[in-house]
Amino acid sequence: LRLIIESQVDAIIFDEKRLNLAKDVITSKDSNVKYFICMDYNEDSNGILSFSKLLKDGKKLIESNSSKYNSISIDKDKLSVLIYTSGTTNNPKAVMLSQYNICSNVSAMTTLIKYEKDDSILVFLPLHHTLACLASFLFCYYIGFRLCFADSIKDIGKNMVEYKISGLVCVPAVLEIMYRQIIRGVKKSGKYTAFKFLCAFSNFLMFFHIDIRRKLFKQVLDNFGGKMRTIIYGSAATDKKVIHLFNTIGIDMLQGYGL
């Protein structure tokens, strides 16, 4: 409630689970909110608007040749987004961003990431974090990737295989888990010595720009769905040996950061 009042927003969009919070905002004398939009309502009710009804009404306006939406003037440098920090050390602070901040980062990602039309990105980080929102949610919409939401953190591995994920945005803790799974699996198979040799051989070939990493480590990559090519990580320090291993087996690692 404090953040809604502090940010002086005109509208809030919420699901039915947050209905009590919305009612608190409605009764608050300090709130500037004019529009309350519920994702789960099919019809407007008690001053709360239905998201699906708004979409239908907007579609009707466009079909009737209304130009209200397309004629809206956008100032790309104007404050458009407030994203609050986690508040780990103190009260959450609002990070002020413009549309240009957001769009320029999403556009720049296309120059760094190799992508194919049938790629899928796995999402499990909170989308109110700038890195997760930019590198997964908005980037997927910009490029046309399929966006897959993980069932839970413990199901990430299963979801990678199920959805044949080609890209992942995560924190170092997830990388550590994946790293341990790889090492544990190789040792269990009794092929750890051969694996270390292939790692050295792969890096030797890469020195001469010969890239057959995905052929050498196909069995390992199959455990992550077989299509994983890129991982974007951030928010904390990552052990170099973890990054080095993923690069060695054919997964390109990119360090991201929130705006």
Residue ranges and their predicted role:
Residues S80-V106:
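Conserved AMP-binding A3 loop
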Residues C103-S120, L127-K218, K227, D252:
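Conserved AMP-binding/adenylation subdomain of ANL enzymes
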Residues C38, K59-Y84, N91, K114-S120:
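Conserved pre-ATP/AMP-binding loop-to-beta segment of ANL
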Residues L1-K56:
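Structural core segment of the AMP-binding/adenylate-forming
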Residues F51-S52, D77, Y100, L125:
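Structural detector for helix-capping/boundary residues
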Residues A173, T230, G234-V242, I251-L259:
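Conserved A3 ("GATE") glycine/threonine-rich loop of ANL adenylate-forming enzymes
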